[in-house]
């Protein structure tokens, strides 16, 4: 069995690191196009892709796509503008969801990074808002919160 056949028989990699490991090549040598603009992700964007806990997009033809920083920001803005539902202040998100904040999936409203517990608690501590957008929760990550 050829290496490509072995790769195709496995579940498709979800992260940039998994893809590099599967192909047995250095991460820096990966060429992954953005799903929206088709520009190849830079090395920094490849690292950030996994840091943000995003997942690779696979087509039926076994083509793989990622999401560049520019398109992530543009997509997040479009989504927030057109699909905003409501906002809650800090810890009120637990009441709305009926579970502890650590169990709630919240992504950054600007870059789509999955927020960690410290980022979620910082939002609560500062009495800032979480936003329900397209049936998902959004907040601010450390980086975007420091830029805003």
From Swiss-Prot:
A molecular function GO annotation: DNA binding
Cellular compartments annotated: Host cytoplasm; Host nucleus
Q: Which GO terms describe its biological process?
A: DNA-templated transcription; regulation of DNA-templated transcription; symbiont-mediated perturbation of host apoptosis; symbiont-mediated perturbation of host ubiquitin-like protein modification; symbiont-mediated suppression of host innate immune response; symbiont-mediated suppression of host type I interferon-mediated signaling pathway
**Any single Pfam family the record assigns to this protein:** E6
Keyword terms = Activator, DNA-binding, Early protein, Host cytoplasm, Host nucleus, Host-virus interaction, Inhibition of host innate immune response by virus, Metal-binding, Modulation of host cell apoptosis by virus, Transcription, Transcription regulation, Viral immunoevasion, Zinc, Zinc-finger
A GO-annotated cellular component:
host cell cytoplasm
InterPro entries from the entry? E6, E6_sf
Q: Where are the unnamed Zn fingers located?
A: 34-71, 108-144
The domain of life for this entry's organism is Viruses
Q: Self-association or partners: how does it assemble?
A: Forms homodimers. Interacts with ubiquitin-protein ligase UBE3A/E6-AP; this interaction stimulates UBE3A ubiquitin activity. Interacts with host BAK1.
Q: What does this protein do?
A: Plays a major role in the induction and maintenance of cellular transformation. E6 associates with host UBE3A/E6-AP ubiquitin-protein ligase and modulates its activity. Protects host keratinocytes from apoptosis by mediating the degradation of host BAK1. May also inhibit host immune response.
Instruction: Give the record's family classification.
Output: Belongs to the papillomaviridae E6 protein family.
Q: What is this protein called?
A: Protein E6
Organism for this UniProt entry:
Human papillomavirus 9
């Amino acid at each position: 069995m050829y290496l490509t056949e072995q790769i195709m028989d496995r579940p498709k990699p979800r992260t940039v690191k998994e893809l590099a490991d599967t192909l047995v090549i250095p991460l820096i040598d990966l060429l992954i196009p953005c799903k929206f603009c088709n520009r190849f992700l830079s090395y920094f964007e490849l690292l950030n892709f996994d840091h943000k806990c995003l997942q690779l997009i696979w087509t039926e033809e076994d083509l793989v796509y990622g999401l560049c920083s520019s398109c992530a920001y543009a997509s997040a803005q479009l989504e927030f503008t057109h699909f905003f539902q409501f906002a809650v202040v800090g810890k009120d998100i637990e009441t709305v969801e009926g579970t502890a904040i650590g169990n709630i999936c919240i992504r950054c409203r600007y870059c789509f990074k999955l927020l960690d517990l410290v980022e979620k608690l910082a939002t609560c501590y500062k009495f800032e808002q979480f936003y329900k957008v397209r049936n998902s929760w959004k907040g601010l990550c450390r980086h975007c919160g420091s830029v805003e």
